[in-house]
């Protein structure tokens, strides 16, 4: 049986990249659960095109404090932890809408790469981080990779990020602000 992988994606006003971000994951056999953090652009409408085609659900995920909507990264990460305990998948990926993930093996898509890692007995996967910056307005006909062509160095401490984990009731994304998924020893 195929290893089932779910990317839990968070987004806020990502209309310019959301279609391609979701599409790239689905094309690599990774399902997507979208947490929309109160977008005011077309992010949700664009994402909804993928419902039941690899996109499991779009959940409005906003937080309030004293009656006002606030951005709460910790609460968002806790929601991702909850979802990974509730959803019926073998592996989970914490991803933002402006991130692109590929398998390191050219002949394997992302799901197949994760399946191989699973067969090797691992329960976490790290990714090397490369920051590409948008230096001009992305045109509608440009892909993310065509538009983001300028690289900026990543801080030494932040180059490797562990954002993929095998299903566990004890996942911890909060302790390292989502950059290092932790499982108990």
Which stretches of residues belong to each language-model region?
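Short beta-strand/loop segment that forms part of the nucleotide-sugar
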Residues: 30-38, 59-62
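Acidic metal-phosphate-binding loop of nucleotide-sugar-dependent transferases
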Residues: 97-101
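N-proximal low-complexity "stem/linker" segments adjacent to membrane-targeting elements
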Residues: 1-23
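Acidic/polar residues in short coil/turn loops that connect beta-strands
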Residues: 41-42
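Active-site-proximal specificity loops/subdomain of glycosyltransferases
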Residues: 47-91, 103
């Amino acid at each position: 049986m195929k290893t089932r992988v779910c990317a839990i994606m968070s987004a806020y006003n990502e209309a310019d990249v959301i279609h391609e971000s979701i599409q790239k994951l689905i094309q690599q056999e990774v399902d997507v659960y979208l947490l929309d953090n109160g977008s005011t652009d077309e992010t949700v409408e664009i994402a909804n095109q993928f419902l039941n085609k690899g996109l499991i659900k779009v959940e409005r995920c906003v937080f309030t404090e004293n009656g006002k909507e606030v951005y709460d990264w910790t609460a968002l990460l806790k929601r991702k932890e909850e979802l990974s305990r509730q959803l019926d998948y073998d592996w989970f990926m914490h991803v933002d809408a402006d991130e692109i993930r590929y398998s390191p093996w050219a002949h394997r898509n992302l799901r197949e790469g994760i399946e191989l890692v699973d067969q090797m007995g691992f329960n976490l996967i790290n990714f090397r981080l490369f920051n590409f910056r948008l230096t001009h307005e992305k045109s509608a006909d440009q892909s993310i990779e065509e538009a983001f062509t300028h690289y900026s160095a990543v801080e030494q401490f932040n180059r490797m990020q562990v954002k993929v984990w095998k299903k566990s009731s004890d996942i911890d994304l909060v302790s390292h602000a989502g950059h290092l998924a932790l499982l108990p020893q």
